[in-house]
Amino acid sequence: MIQTTFPDRAVMAELVAKMLWEIKAVHFNAGEPYKLSSGMASPVYIDCRKLLSYPRIRSTVMDFAASTLMRDAGFEQFDCIAGGETAGIPFAALLADRLGLPMIYVRKQPKGHGRNAQIEGNMPEGSRVLVIEDLTTAGGSMFKFIDAVRAAGGIVDHGIALFFYDIFGQQRFTDGKVRLHHIATWRNVLAVAKAQQLFDDKTLAEVEAFLDAPLAWSGRNGGVCELSL
């Protein structure tokens, strides 16, 4: 199904933030911080995989993803959608269906030998590939998949994350010549928390302290205090 409606960007961000709260995908624990794949300690965590269990929400989020891409990237910019193992795979399938495109998935580790050892599915040489992940912090994990696609002969100029932490900017993507698209960020989630009084004042202050200085907060709480972006 090709997306033909284009909701306001701010409306989409707010609605996705509300959906994440509604399905209890937002978690907070400053006493025992979450360890992100980057090695950072974080008092907050988003479980975007829960979106898959709620069909109406899942469908709406994928509609938003499709409209975001067609508005900001174009209608004929991609030949294939790639999902990263594991969380990106179902979202890649859903988005490929929305856009009427083939889908592949990228393994975390090669299986066998050769240029396509990490790629499952058919990706002709020179295919313009969009890589999708459920969420990204600084882009480290997404670029492992992007690099694998490029090594196999694909062209990757765009990536999309349904949720972007948005605490380090997009330098990694700029350096890697990839335009990152996203729908919602932690600031959107925090705005909903404030409006609906979902966090008490102490919790809000702790979350804001992390968002304002994430590496300093991480270092004080057992995580890394610098990243190689």
Curated annotation (Swiss-Prot):
Q: Does the keyword Magnesium apply?
A: yes
Superkingdom in the source lineage: Bacteria
- Annotated keywords: Glycosyltransferase, Magnesium, Pyrimidine biosynthesis, Transferase
Q: Name one GO molecular function term.
A: orotate phosphoribosyltransferase activity
For binding 5-phospho-alpha-D-ribose 1-diphosphate, which residues are annotated in this chain's numbering?
Answer: 107-108, 111, 113, 133-141
Q: Name one GO biological process term.
A: pyrimidine nucleobase biosynthetic process
Query: At which positions is orotate bound?
Result: 137
Catalyzes what? orotidine 5'-phosphate + diphosphate = orotate + 5-phospho-alpha-D-ribose 1-diphosphate
To which pathway does this protein belong?
Pyrimidine metabolism; UMP biosynthesis via de novo pathway; UMP from orotate: step 1/2
Q: Which residues cross the membrane?
A: none
Q: What is its EC number?
A: 2.4.2.10
- Where is the secretion signal located? none
List cofactor names only.
Answer: Mg(2+)
Is Coiled coil included in the keywords of this UniProt record?
Answer: no
Describe the protein's quaternary organization and the partners it interacts with.
Homodimer.
- Summary of the function given for this chain in its UniProt record: Catalyzes the transfer of a ribosyl phosphate group from 5-phosphoribose 1-diphosphate to orotate, leading to the formation of orotidine monophosphate (OMP).
Question: What NCBIfam families does this protein's entry cite?
Answer: PRK00455.1-3, pyrE
Q: Give the UniProt family note.
A: Belongs to the purine/pyrimidine phosphoribosyltransferase family. PyrE subfamily.
Q: Identify this protein by name.
A: Orotate phosphoribosyltransferase
